[in-house]
Amino acid sequence: MNVNVINHPLVRHKLTLMREADCSTYKFRTLATELARLMAYEASRDFEIEKYLIDGWCGQIEGDRIKGKTLTVVPILRAGLGMLDGVLDLIPTAKISVVGLQRDEETLKPISYFEKFVDSMDERPALIIDPMLATGGSMVATIDLLKAKGCKNIKALVLVAAPEGVKAVNDAHPDVTIYTAALDSHLNENGYIIPGLGDAGDKIFGTR
């Protein structure tokens, strides 16, 4: 499976705090931002760099910068917005693309009700953010949309993943790497990740 579980002590600590049943909206939202920031550091580890010259205090010196078009961050509405600030804290120049999905009542498959992509998608790396990778349907649909725009370098950043969701993404898009803070046990009969986080969107937006 093309999945990278970020096993950093701070990531594990903060994720456990999010799992607490009495975690407040403020605390949950803050931790989601902090985790996204830490995890984005790992997800950006293989960014390609190039050399260029700058004027330093002692004269001209050679330095490094990220090569190519700026990353586009792609939150899946609405829960993905809860991770956006954390990624932007680390990569403030990132461009933001947005995808909104809903379930077709006949096919039960996710369909797009809103999508807004930045320009030159075929030249940019994309980082999809969503707290939960459960069945994988929304993630697969989002990757489909990105590839239809010509995007070739795609990663997914999620707080918690279920094996079922990871398998769905890997089966449909084996070239996409998933970064997660935890690979949990399974989905229950209602499609919730166990032990998971509950409804991350409701907890982030205070609508639970």
From Swiss-Prot:
Domain of life from the UniProt record: Bacteria
Entry binding sites for uracil: 193, 198-200
Gene3D superfamilies assigned to the protein according to its UniProt record, in alphabetical order: 3.40.50.2020
CDD domains attached to this UniProt entry: PRTases_typeI
Regulation: Allosterically activated by GTP.
Pathway of action: Pyrimidine metabolism; UMP biosynthesis via salvage pathway; UMP from uracil: step 1/1
The protein's enzyme class: transferase
Biological-process GO terms, alphabetical: UMP salvage; uracil salvage
Protein name: Uracil phosphoribosyltransferase
Gene expressing this chain: upp
